């Protein structure tokens, strides 16, 4: 290299080559780790194996810078200039486009440099960040395309080493098309600049270290903030707890240096607590049971009811607990009715729910009997004779209580009035044919005798004199044999002798 050239004609590449040559000649002959003496000439040394990359952290870069600046107190690594070369003069980073810097490519790998920022003007503290016009013209094609300069983004961040602030870090992005009435265009060139001290701005002439890379992928540094908001929504606004029942979802992300080193290597584990699984299963299970019960009711031919008339509260409780909450006189179909009807048609009860289904079956028949009882008392059609002779209400309820000995048997008196009258007429006609001679003197039909037998003693006195005591006896006899409705002998003898 010709060192007799004037200082103004020395380029940045010549300075770097001189530094590398000087380091090779004056380099250490010992291994910095074990102290082993290295034999052979520097040109005989082999390089590092393929795949080895120089990717120091922020703290490590500050330590290298501190060792470079404070050479008396800290000993710099003998090979540090091989990985972080120093650029001086007007060919520095603040003047040269990143593509013109030695070793910088667009493959996303980062390159590190020691350099000294310069002022934009002779007076003031503003730093020069404008790229040289000549380089800008060669890249853009014309001078009318605007200026190209580094623009700081974000705030200056402190760099902590062992709990103490050793330096500061600022991030700059390269923009093009700067100028009046122009809209700057952002490029993918990024620079991280580090300087020593606690002040946000570096001192004049101070040596700094910068990392430059071409960002090949969108930055993902804000990914953790978006996931923290998701954690606040899913986990109740705080850090996800590891206990409390229910599972935890673990999301792992390795940021690495996929964007060319824009994000430092780190791993983040975000725990998102989902809602209680039992509540979800209860709610979904209750809805599925409701749909299944409605489908079973339609298949069994049961009357359809609105969803608000069915009792599905709460979903997680068994059907017998729901039965205690329901009032049997409401007249609406409950969940037990639907399930019992489905059980009766399928005839395949589950072994785990046989006890509950038997209880529901008994409750279902009892409720059907009560509903029919209410329907008979309310909607019983009025007979013309009943408007003249109406039996007492107490007698009617007494007969029902006497006959209600079997809860699974529907008695004849609980059937509709039309079927009851038809059966009684057919039975009375058969008895009249069988006892034609015996019943020849009767002037009333069998149905009228039945109604007359259920009347009070005063009515019997009006029809036939002197039969008040006999009417009470007939009333007791009718209550005793009300299931078969035979004609009492006393009444036959009375009519025969009358």
UniProtKB/Swiss-Prot annotation:
Family matches, as Pfam families: NAM
One of the record's GO molecular function terms: DNA-binding transcription factor activity
Protein keywords: Activator, Cell wall biogenesis/degradation, Developmental protein, DNA-binding, Nucleus, Transcription, Transcription regulation
Biased composition (Polar residues): 466-475
Main subcellular localisation: nucleus
GO annotation terms (biological process): cell wall organization; positive regulation of DNA-templated transcription; regulation of vegetative phase change; tracheary element differentiation
GO cellular component: nucleus
Keyword set includes Amino-acid biosynthesis: no
Compartment list: Nucleus
InterPro entries in alphabetical order: NAC-dom (IPR003441), NAC_dom_sf (IPR036093), SOG1-like (IPR044799)
DNA-binding stretch(es), residue numbering of this chain: 166-221
Keyword 4Fe-4S: no
Residue stretches of biased makeup (Low complexity): 256-266
Annotated region described as Disordered, given as residue ranges: 225-278, 338-374, 423-443, 457-498
Bias-annotated ranges (Basic residues): 356-374
Domain spans labelled NAC: 48-215
Biased composition range(s): Gly residues: 233-248
Expressing tissues: Expressed in the vascular cylinder of roots. Expressed in the differentiation zone of the root stele.
Note: Overexpression of NAC075 induces the formation of ectopic xylem vessel-like elements.
Task performed by this protein: Transcription activator involved in xylem formation. Promotes the expression of the secondary wall-associated transcription factor MYB46. Functions upstream of NAC030/VND7, a master switch of xylem vessel differentiation. Acts as a upstream regulator of NAC101/VND6 and LBD30/ASL19.
Domain remark from Swiss-Prot or TrEMBL: The NAC domain includes a DNA binding domain and a dimerization domain.
Protein's recorded name: NAC domain-containing protein 75
